[in-house]
Amino acid sequence: MERIARKAVKKNAVAPEPRVIALLLVVCGLSGCGIASRIRGAFEPSAEVADQGYSRDDELRLNHLQVKGTHNSYHRRPRFALVREHDYEQAPLDVQLGEYGVRAVELDIHPSSRGYEVYHLPVIDSRSTCALLIDCLGVLKRWSDSNPGHHPLFVWIEPKDELGGGDFDMDALDAEILSVWPRERLVTPALVKGGRESVREAIVEVGWPTLGEVRGRAMFMLLDRGRQRDAYLRGGKGPGALDGRVLFVHANPVDFDEPFAAVAKIDDPSSAHIAAALEKGIIVGSNVGSALLSDERNIQKLQAGLRNGVHLLTGDYPAPVKGRTYWFDMPGGSPSRCNPITAPAGCASTDVEAPGILRGRTRPAGG
């Protein structure tokens, strides 16, 4: 049995040509990538899902990607920004997906009598392009329906409760997601787990699903490092903690061997924990491109994330903005690219996703 951690760096790896990102030269690091061996898993695509036209869909897996994402993806600039870190604005979600090549988003949710509201902070930073979670989910789903050839969308959900009133109703959260995205259109813990004892065991012994098995889907992840995460796990970390659940949950570094460990948000793209996570097949997200930081510092963070194989690179600037020279456009992406650490040899960005066949040949099952 070959473990998922196994990889070999190609000899004579060649650095890609530097790419100018809004007048600043960003060298993205080595394109030479590791060869991550996988055992063919028990993930069989639904009979209703036709070939989308990608020749390596039965080989490339979900953790072979490097994806452009946005931080606080719903965010609108406050009318009066009191602090610099709030002074930015994101385009509507469908514009981010369709025009900017974003494939990973973050949504902050707050419980209310209307359902889950989506915004950053009460009063001082509360403007949003989609006021309710169900609205945001609908925007993402409609875009996906129209573009079934996309690789999975990654959606971080961060529960926020400023009053500290207790745990979220996690069953209600699952139900709200399922009211828009049916299970057959999701990458769920159950899909990854298959017949194995736990998600972790499946990732180690089988690997993530292939892209062909999960095109046109979305993958939801709970971004919480403590109480709300534990509530979603029903207070336990055993093999069955995610049974029936819709979302994966963030794994802290001390949790990387726990049965639920599959995704991790490691804010610092230079962290040594990233390499440890990649060795275990964990999908990693990091923050790059903050409104709070200088253009120079943002470039440094982006370079580190690209070079270190972070899968989901999220930031405040997915497109050029007035007053800043930094913005993030994936080097060599179409719009995503092959991960420089985990993808197999010969992987091309158009194997991951290609604009010319984004609309696919048929709609995925459950559309």
PLM feature spans:
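Sec-dependent N-terminal signal peptides
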Residues: 21-27
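Catalytic cores of phosphodiester-bond hydrolases, prominently lipid phosphodiesterases
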Residues: 35-367
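C-terminal motif of bacterial Sec signal peptides marking the signal peptidase cleavage site
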Residues: 31-32
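Coiled-coil-like amphipathic alpha-helices with heptad-repeat character
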Residues: 1-2, 14, 354-356
